[in-house]
């Protein structure tokens, strides 16, 4: 059981005797064992209280309150904000009841916050051991304690918290400058113009150079945007095909990511 300093019950592990439905049998806090290879993974099951709200687990575009959701805490390309996948998952969450949990694992985890059973939060972890940090207090205290463990980021410049103007994608110097002019003319106050994949010579294939046929003078463009009060962000992708001029340097220098069997990791190269 987790209780606060005044003895209030915050949450507790669920056991087989806690089943409160005659029809639906919820597995208690357990290990899941696979017959194929005898491996195990842990499945912590905790109480989820009425009106409890859960926040965290990283960047996602679903509802801020995760109760009622099944959150996949693993890196995927969500292909847009309409899905529940995450570029930046974080195995940490906190509750409005005054506690937070950091799952100290890099293994894929599925957090079922009352999605399949409203009275339980179920953590399906791809790990044989459970290493949890549990924090107590108001949200600001929980976050402060969590970052005491994982590290605190420095305060970013004020402009980074402003509006970033982007799309997939601005393909030319003139298009970027035109967007900047229209934003100022219409008194829309963004701080950043972001060029997605379209600034490369070949879309999606990052060679860290502006396409010469579409960006005639990128230095002048950057100076113009800076004069108008814009910061410029350039999208980058650490993905190199054999035709990329940096490919051989990457492979020969031992900088490429390899699969477990030693072969190069690739998609459609």
What are these model-predicted stretches?
Residues 1-160, 167-169, 173-174, 180-185:
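Catalytic and substrate-binding clefts that recognize carbohydrates or anionic sugar/phosphate headgroups
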Residues 48, 154-269:
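Aromatic-lined carbohydrate-binding/catalytic grooves of carbohydrate-active enzymes
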């Amino acid at each position: 059981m987790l209780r606060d300093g005044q003895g209030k019950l915050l949450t507790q592990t669920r056991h087989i005797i806690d089943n409160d439905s005659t029809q639906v049998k919820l597995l208690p806090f357990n290990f899941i064992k696979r017959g194929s290879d005898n491996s195990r993974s842990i499945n912590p099951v905790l109480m989820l209280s009425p009106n409890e709200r859960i926040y965290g687990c990283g960047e996602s575009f679903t509802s801020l309150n995760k109760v009622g959701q099944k959150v996949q805490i693993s890196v995927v390309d969500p292909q847009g904000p309409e899905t529940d996948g995450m570029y930046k998952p974080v195995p940490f969450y906190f509750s409005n009841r005054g506690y937070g949990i950091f799952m100290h694992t890099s293994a894929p985890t599925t957090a079922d916050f009352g999605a399949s059973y409203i009275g339980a939060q179920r953590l399906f972890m791809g790990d044989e051991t459970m290493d949890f940090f549990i924090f107590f207090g108001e949200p600001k205290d929980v976050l402060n304690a969590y970052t005491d463990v994982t590290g605190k980021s420095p305060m970013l410049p004020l402009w980074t918290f402003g509006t970033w103007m982007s799309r997939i994608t601005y393909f030319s110097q003139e298009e970027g400058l035109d967007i900047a002019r229209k934003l100022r003319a219409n008194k829309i106050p963004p701080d950043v113009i972001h060029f997605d994949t379209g600034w490369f010579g070949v879309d999606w294939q990052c060679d860290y150079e502006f396409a010469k046929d579409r960006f005639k003078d990128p230095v002048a463009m950057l100076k113009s945007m800076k004069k108008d009060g814009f910061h410029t962000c350039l999208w980058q992708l650490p993905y190199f095909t054999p035709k990329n001029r940096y490919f051989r340097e990457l492979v020969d220098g031992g900088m490429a990511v390899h699969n477990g069997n030693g072969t190069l990791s690739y998609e459609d190269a």
